[in-house]
Amino acid sequence: NYGWPISSYGERGYGEFSKDVPLHKSHKDYGFVEPIKVYSPSIAISEITKIPKIFNENFTNNFFISTLGWEGQLANGQQSIHHLRFNENFDQIIFEDVIPIDERIRDLIYIKEMNLVLLVLETIPAIGILRLTN
């Protein structure tokens, strides 16, 4: 358990509820696991997808994180795909990259038979394709 809604490095954003229930910044002090990665301010995560090694031989313990967000927020990591690679124990990020899309990404779907990732884009609406090329 990572602590939500008791502990978070983010901020509450929903009115009266935030006055009645404190949001603690420490996780460990309240019996929760400290997060490995924190996005503050929020990048508006919409999907987290494990990307298999077949996608790329170097992709061991890799995840794509899609984000929503608003126009003009690319610099804050919104409307992008965040690529994270974890160590063997999944307790440390050993690689991180951001792929700007400049569109709200509602969903990511890995299609094994075609070895590609579909992006379901919200605002346009459209479907994007993420495929590795040599």
Predicted regions and their residues:
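Blade-level signature of beta-propeller repeat domains, shared across WD40, Kelch, NHL, RCC1
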Residues: 107-134
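Conserved blade-ending motifs and adjacent loop-strand segments that build the rim/top face
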Residues: 90-112
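Beta-propeller domain segments
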Residues: 1-94, 129-132
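A generic structural signal for well-ordered alpha-helical surface patches
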Residues: 79-82, 103-106, 115
